[in-house]
Structure formats: structure tokens, C-alpha cells
Amino acid sequence: AFYNGNQEVFRFIDVFYIMNVEKGSPWRNHLIHQYKDAITKAGFSGIHMDTYGFPKRAYSHLQEQPRLVRLDQEFCGLIDETRKGLEEAADDPCLVFNNVGNWPVGETAKSTVDAVYIEVWSPYDRYCHIKQLIQEAKYFSGNKKPVILAAYLAPFRTESDALAANAAYILTAAIVSNGGYHLLLGENNAVLTQGYYGDYSIMPDETAVVMRKYYDFMIRYLNIFYDQTLQDVSMTHIGWDNYEYQCGFQNWSVNAEAGKVWITIRENEKLKCLYLINLCGCGEDNWNKGKAEPIIQKDLTFTVNVDGDIQGIYCASPDRDSCKSESLEYSYIQNEKGKFVTFTVAELFVWTVVYLKL
């Protein structure tokens, strides 16, 4: 087992010992063999390695004198040894590691996991933290691995169906617009509300229908959400004297402020994308609290700097009857700062994506 600074065994909820997984520990070898048995004997197709988040440092008693171990320096080796063991047991096994509270994603994202998996807990409370988590995970993995957020929605357990539903729509939009994936839903309208998966809640049928539409929307526009060449320029290309993107209205934010239209901007050589999420009517920006239905925003005008003529501007939303893209009318403007296109989004309910084909 691992020991605390008092040289007492670490216990979890007074039931489990927190075991020593440092390199050379007998428990580490035992653990990897158990993982292999789960593949070969129980028929699992992969392994989800879990942690408690605490402790991050612990004492090992494997030698004559207690030795302080930094777990962030041990996990990557454990992951990579597990990967090797699984590949000896099966073809193409899946392996993920739970970075509880985003720790230690800076190290584990570089390991041989198939995706960067983060269980989201306080103090990552706000919508802007959701974006931060996804951006950092992409950076640490070299933008080579999917980012999955296990962000459990307590409102389905503690608040009204309507407030919980709106929280789910907005959080889905937030995660997908920033190129992440959300672990939330299960079979038969089940929804995760806390870390113990067996204690789940059930979504109303009408909420499940909308969520299905949101996921269909995500799949339909995979190239707009998950193209790894899309670079987020939200903090550098709008506001102040950044003329690349301009809003003809005042209640916008790139930081997911309550009461405003949250704008995320991502672009590459072929596309300029604006992801619009309606936080108007939200009294706060905590992703894990129920939300009132957003106040519909109308006639949102944008002006975007372009290098030449474009192919077209298109708008799509899962909040409409159809998720099909609609062509937007636009006009060119030329001035001393260059060439621009201006266009208007007629309505924003919860989530809308606008993309310019260059």
C-alpha cells in the first residue's frame, strides 16, 4: 500500500487501501495481469484505468526507508506497461486513463492512451473551464487524441426536468463546439449525474429526443467540430482592434459570460467557423446548474475579414426542424483595412454554427 506523511496506510472511505503502483511494486505487476485477464477471460475490449485524484504524493515502504513517490511520474509508465500487456493479450485493445479533476493530464496525455479522458470536478465549475480543459488536453496530446469529458449533470437528480434539459443542451453545445466529446448518456434515457454510475437518473422522453438531435447534429458536422487543423482564434481575432471578426451587437463574449452570446471562433485554410451558444437569460455560468430556457436572440450581424472572394456562408442549428445547412446572404465591404463580408444570423435559440467556405 501507499502511506501518508504520518506513515499510516492510505485508505479510501475506510474500506479500500490505496495500493502502491510504483515501478517494481508487486501490486503493479498484479494489476496489469488483472487487466489482461479482463480482456482474455471476461471478454472486455479495453480497459478504463481509474484513480481517486488524491493522493498525488505518497510514501512507499518497499525499501528500508520510506521514500516519497510522485504519482504523476509513475502513471505514464504504468499506462505504457499496461498497453504492452494488453497488446500481448488481444488485437487492438482500447486503453483510457481517468484524469480526475484534470490531473495529471499534462503527463498522461503523452502516454499510450487512446484518448484523453478527464473527469470534471470543482474548481472547474464554469463554461469557460470546459473550453480550457479541452484546449489544454489537445495541446498536451499534440492535438492527436480525442478529448472526452466526464462532466456529470447533477441537475437531472436535483432540479426540475426543464432546468436540467437546458443545462444538458448548453453543455453539449459547449463541449462539441470546442472539439470535445461528452460522457453523459446511457441506455434507455439514462443520464449520469454523479461519479457512481449505478446511481443514474432518467431523462424525460422529450429531453431524450432533443439530445438525440444534438448528437445527430454533431455527427453530421464532424468536419466542422473535429477537424484537427481548425485553430481556435477566439482570444486573438475579435474585440479591441482585432478586425478579423466583428459583431454588430454588444452582448457577446468569448469567455462564456452569463447573459451573453458565447462565441467560439475556429479556422483553417478552407473554413472560418463561428460557434454561437446562447447564454442570454442565464443568471450564472456554472455548467452543473440548471438553466432557464435562453432568451431567443434575433438579427445577429457579423463582419468577417477575408482574403478574397468566398464560396459561401452557411448556417446550421439542431434547434430547427432540420439540421440542414442554410445559405446566408452576404455582401462584401472594402475599406482601408481590407476586404470583408457582412451577414446576419436571423435567430439564435441555443446553438448555431456559421461557417464560411473560402
Protein language model regions, located:
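Carbohydrate-binding surface patches
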Residues: 247-308, 352
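Substrate-binding cleft/loops of secretory-pathway carbohydrate-active enzymes
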Residues: 48, 55-57, 91-137, 157-176
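Solvent-exposed beta-hairpin/edge-strand motifs
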Residues: 297-325
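C-terminal beta-strand-rich structural cap/linker in extracellular carbohydrate-active enzymes
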Residues: 334-358
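Aromatic/acidic polysaccharide-binding cleft in carbohydrate-active enzymes
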Residues: 51-55, 144-236
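Aromatic- and acidic-residue-enriched segments that line the glycan-binding/catalytic groove
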Residues: 1-12, 59-66, 113-115
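Active-site-adjacent "subsite" loops/lids of carbohydrate-active enzymes
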Residues: 1-42
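Active-site and adjacent substrate-binding regions of carbohydrate-active enzymes
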Residues: 26-105, 110, 132
